[in-house]
């Protein structure tokens, strides 16, 4: 079977709460790091989440 192009990534909160989301991204079409505005339930606000590698 062929290996998938999509790679698992972790989106870490920039608020410093330690909260994160996991998702996948296509490295060929989006080689740059993702930055998304999502809800952080710890601070109960929408903050910027930045891409990090899953260990």
UniProtKB/Swiss-Prot annotation:
Molecular function (Gene Ontology), one example: structural constituent of ribosome
Positions where N-methylalanine occurs in the chain: 2
CC annotations in GO: cytoplasm; cytosol; cytosolic large ribosomal subunit
Keywords: Methylation, Ribonucleoprotein, Ribosomal protein, RNA-binding, tRNA-binding
One BP term from GO: response to antibiotic
Keyword Ribosomal protein: yes
Protein family membership: Belongs to the bacterial ribosomal protein bL33 family.
Protein name: Large ribosomal subunit protein bL33
Organism annotation: Escherichia coli (strain K12)
